[in-house]
Amino acid sequence: MEHDTSSNGNCRERILEAAGEIFAEFGFRGATVRKICERAKVNIAAINYYFGGKEKLYSEVLRHWHDFAIKKYPLFFGVGEDAPVEEQLRGFIRSFLFRLLDKGKPAWFGKLMMREMTEPTRAFERLVKEIVRPRDKVLASLVGKMIGTPVSEEEIRLCCASIIGQCLYYYNARSIIKRLYRQDVTQPDEIERIADHVMQFSLKGLEHNSKHSEDRTKIEAESQISDPMTGSSPRIPHSAREIDPVF
């Protein structure tokens, strides 16, 4: 099959956009090469020519549109890395929510990502390695700085999950929210309002977690102080050692 090289870029872009829509709608297994080519208005052999098959196309769709979304909504939403950590966290939350909820191009990207999380394909490992894990490390670093005192990896992970979970709720429940409260969470002003709420709610949780960690560190330090008369550590009442867990 001959291809007009002058239109190669345009053809490739049409395939990527059409494939993203089809994969988001039907999933990897339900999407067919024929459906994608019909949507893109290209020859059925074009997918093999440009991408080497459906599976490689799927991986490229995830990478291409994630890069597009990050370019549109950078990880910190324009907040500099030298900005206060609280502002960086706010930027992170805003960016994540806009990538999930924005109705602009590509509006289907959030749906496609959710599909991959719930119905993993062979592209899942690459998705985790190139997209999810780097984002997770950034958020974990911010959370650790916000808490301030030494905390376990598990505690940081729980805090990160709580922040991400709040954001995902508004994506997964957007239809129910609209029906119950007549609130369209895909509108920019609503996304900003949600971001403010998630930020404030998360700040309170992180502050409580920080105090919890400080109290525990203090108790552990006191337990190591030896009694000058006996040379043994004083007994701390059981109730004083038990600090209510945050989560």
Question: What do the predicted segments below correspond to?
Answer:
Residues 9-17, 50-78, 125, 129:
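An amphipathic alpha-helix adjacent to DNA-recognition modules
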Residues 133-157, 180-183, 206-211:
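Hydrophobic alpha-helical bundle segments that form small-molecule/ligand-binding pockets
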Residues 14, 22-56, 60, 64:
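Helix-turn-helix
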Residues 87, 121-147, 196, 200:
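Amphipathic alpha-helical packing segments from all-alpha helical-bundle domains
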Residues 15-23, 163, 202:
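Short hydrophobic clusters on alpha-helical segments that form packing/core surfaces
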Residues 104-126, 174-180:
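Amphipathic alpha-helical segments used for helix-helix packing
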Residues 1-10, 211-247:
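N-terminal intrinsically disordered/low-complexity leader segments
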Residues 74-109, 156-163:
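Hydrophobic alpha-helical connector segments
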